[in-house]
Amino acid sequence: MTLPMSWDEWTRHDGTALAARVRSGELTARELAKQAAAGIARVNPALSAVIEVFEDAIDDPAGNGANPDGPFAGLPFLMKDLGPTMKGRLQEMGSLMMRGNRAASDTFLTGKFRQAGLNLIGRTTTPEFGVCSSAENPAVY
């Protein structure tokens, strides 16, 4: 896969700079999401930090509800698997008891993230119900 920028170039940009490149037309939100997904694929086997990548959000950021005119236009963003919900997406809160739980609606905060232009591309691990400091539950992840 050909990426739109080198990893050295990627790391020299913060989120607002990456979003500015999308707004200017220098990059597309899809290219940015593909680069983020490639980075996740590269480091996640060692970290086990991302439990789900939303391929549909990577392939079609606008279809995922990201505002193309927001201050964070097209910026890939990972949601903690706890707290704000995304309609139709799993939210299992790091718990076997919640396995298969799908959100019925976006929360207010999720709506604000989307309005700001963030492209919600996946979920990250969380300790069970956020109660402790470690998300190393092999039965869940």
Region spans (language model):
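Gly/Ser-rich catalytic/binding loops embedded in alpha/beta enzyme cores
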Residues: 2-141
